[in-house]
A protein has these predicted regions:
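The catalytic "switch" region of P-loop NTPases
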Residues: 2-7, 12-127
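C-terminal leucine-rich, beta-strand-based interaction scaffolds used for sensing/assembly
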Residues: 122-293
Length: 293
């Protein structure tokens, strides 16, 4: 008998997701059958494992008495952490990939910090004039997922293919194209949770409202005066889903010792619920595509 180990991976199960009984029933059946087959493989000492890759937002709309046990016993949640600066494991991943493209003799002599300083600017200025580190600038425009970071860096390379580092100008110039990518990503993820009409009208509302930060009462007033333009929207539900998918976060200010400091919470960074009493804030990575500044 062969000593080889085999792994069968099912990916892209969320393609064309619809929040409908037949879709959910098929996914539930696939999860349960996979669990049974993997258990059988283990008992028979078969060196094979089946892995299903599924988004959490889809898993949590599935209802079945066996799913909680399967989640506890047999699932692994891929989490790249909440850190959005140079200490993020995402930047460790990027630096590892950069090392692989370097001369081995040179690469061995460089620390991660050395590579970071050589290839990225120390800081960038935001539209409000704040000075922040380049890792924080880049990661703040992502959902802290590898594909977001890699896509952003690839767009930067496309803008300045001859440069051996990521310049401030290229990072900022690539932001609009990257924002278009992120916008398409989030629209695809919202499919099945909202109709196509709801998705289009919801983003149209944000775009026409033209505010990156606002209270519920403000957008409600704007919406109520223009309901004929957004006939498919339930505003409360739209904001809840936009919060759950990271399109919007909450923002609040704390005053201490005569100084004010703003805080932000987004669902992709913390396990938080929407707070309609706090301000809403549009995700940085979507603002260019929505023409919000």
């Amino acid at each position: 008998m062969s000593d080889s180990k085999y792994t069968i991976i099912f990916d892209e199960l969320d393609d064309q997701f619809r929040n409908e009984d037949i879709y959910k029933s098929n996914i539930i059946s696939l999860i349960k059958v996979t669990e049974r087959i993997n258990s059988l493989f283990y008992k028979k000492n078969v060196k094979c494992k089946i892995i299903l890759l599924l988004r959490l937002d889809i898993f949590y709309v599935l209802n079945d008495p066996d799913l909680n046990k399967i989640e506890e016993d047999s699932s692994v949640k891929i989490d790249w952490g909440k850190n959005d600066d140079k200490n993020s494991p995402l930047f460790d991943m990027i630096i590892l990939k950069l090392r692989q493209s370097m001369d081995p003799k040179i690469e061995k002599k460089l620390s991660n910090q050395d590579i970071l300083e050589q290839l990225f600017p120390e800081s960038l200025h935001t539209s409000k004039g704040r000075c922040i580190s380049s890792p924080k600038y880049i990661l703040g425009r992502t959902y802290l997922r590898p594909r977001d970071v890699v896509t952003y860096l690839n767009h930067i390379k496309d803008i300045s293919p001859d440069k051996e580092y990521f310049s401030k100008e290229a990072i900022k110039s690539a932001e609009r194209k990257y924002s278009s990518y992120l916008f398409k990503e989030i629209k695809n993820e919202l499919c099945g949770h909202l109709s196509n009409e709801e998705i289009d009208e919801s983003f149209k509302l944000l775009k026409q409202f033209k505010k990156v930060s606002f209270y519920y009462a403000e957008i409600e007033e704007y919406y109520m005066k223009r309901t004929n333009l957004f006939p498919h929207i339930n505003l409360h539900r739209m904001l809840e889903l936009f919060f759950n998918f990271g399109v919007l976060g909450n923002q609040w200010t704390v005053k201490k010792n005569g100084k004010s400091r703003s805080y932000y919470s987004f669902s992709h960074r913390e396990n938080v619920d929407i707070d309609f009493d706090k301000k809403f804030n549009v995700h940085l990575g979507l603002r260019k595509e929505l023409n919000l500044y």
